[in-house]
Curated annotation (Swiss-Prot):
One of its GO terms (cellular component) is cytoplasm. This is Uroporphyrinogen decarboxylase. The gene is hemE. Pathway: Porphyrin-containing compound metabolism; protoporphyrin-IX biosynthesis; coproporphyrinogen-III from 5-aminolevulinate: step 4/4. The keyword Lyase applies.
Length: 350
């Protein structure tokens, strides 16, 4: 068997190899738009149970695989999953999202953080990733993921989702030393978590800095980029050839800066035209994205046209097709099926 037949398509594209077609997966491809997931959620209402009980997390991760055969199967988890292992417990309330009862507001709390040992605090990750690898074999690429330091710090400091990030920005601009100390600790823990996911079987890992798009470019350079880079540098020192993706929501203002983090692939959201993203990131940077998730509410002809447009603009090297954000609740499952089907046959439409 040749190397290309042995190695999954998305992994080859992530490594920068020439591939026979553009690989495709979707952020949040396992989730609430699928009836099979909603039925399981009725039975197991706790999000943490669904994501930390290996049998449930494996079943959920594989739901879109069985339905649509995407080129990437991402483990069902949450970016906050490692926080309890750092001494920051959280819960996820269905209608409210994540809640952290004792948000981090002082240097004393930062100093009291627990040393993070992923094998000890997250043993279920090994089971989930290992089983996913066995289940999909070489037919798909298994993706892991982590939250980036700024975004995890934002949750831990705000205590919940925020519209204006006033509490973390207050700390950033009035007590920057406390925030830098916290970000450094998170970066080191997340680097260890990435390495652990690699050792457990992940083949590509995406780092979500979901809230970094809320920073001005100069503050991104101060509070987000150095800690993204710290994670990447630590991982690359141990696993230099492992493909890493960086995703930021609302990243138009910091796109070039994302490329400076050291990642292999920049995941572009839909607020940037893919042709512009290619130009701004340079010919050597691989890209992922970037169809507006709302497109999947449109007609199938409309969906097909947007797929063709994105693939044309991205070109035939170093592109992983994806949405510019997670698939939206209420998206018709048949349109998701059509999306994957069309993506896999897109070469015949070009």
């Amino acid at each position: 068997m040749s190397e290309s037949n042995n190695t999954p398509l998305l992994l080859r594209a992530a490594r920068g190899e020439k591939v026979e077609r553009t690989p495709v997966w979707m952020m949040r491809q396992a989730g609430r738009y699928m009836k099979i997931y909603r039925d399981l959620r009725e039975k197991y209402p706790s999000f943490r149970e669904r994501s930390e009980n290996p049998d449930l997390a494996i079943e959920i991760s594989l739901q879109p695989w069985h339905a649509f055969q995407p080129d990437g199967v991402i483990m069902f988890s949450d970016i906050l999953t490692p926080l309890p292992g750092m001494g920051i417990p959280f819960d996820i309330i269905e209608s409210k999202g994540p809640i952290i009862e004792n948000p981090i507001r002082t240097q004393a709390q930062v100093d009291a953080m627990t040393p993070f040992d992923p094998a000890e605090s997250l043993p279920f990750i090994k089971t989930i990733l290992g089983t996913l690898r066995q289940e999909v074999g070489n037919a798909s690429t298994v993706l892991g993921f982590v939250g980036a330091p700024w975004t995890l710090a934002a949750y831990a400091i705000e205590g919940k989702s925020s519209k204006n990030y006033a509490i973390i920005k207050n700390m950033a601009f009035s007590e920057p030393a406390v925030l830098h100390s916290f970000l450094g600790k998170i970066a080191d823990a997340i680097a260890d978590y990435v390495c652990y996911q690699i050792e457990c079987g992940a083949q590509v890992i995406q780092m979500f800095d979901s809230w970094a798009g809320q920073l001005s470019p100069q503050d991104y350079d101060m509070f987000a980029l150095p800690y993204q880079k710290r994670v990447v540098d630590k991982v690359k020192a141990k696993y230099p050839d492992f493909p890493l993706i960086l995703y930021i929501s609302g990243s138009a203002g910091v796109l070039e800066r994302m490329g400076k983090s050291g990642v292999d692939i920049v995941s572009v959201d839909w607020t940037v035209d893919m042709a512009d993203a290619r130009q701004r990131l340079g010919k050597d940077m691989k890209v992922q994205g970037n169809i507006d998730p709302g497109v999947l509410f449109g007609s199938q002809d409309f969906i097909k046209a947007r797929i063709i447009d994105t693939v044309r603009k991205a070109g035939n090297w170093g592109h992983i097709l994806n949405l510019g954000h997670g698939v939206l609740v209420g998206t018709p499952e048949d349109n998701v099926r059509f999306f994957f089907e069309t993506c896999k046959n897109v070469q015949s439409f070009l």
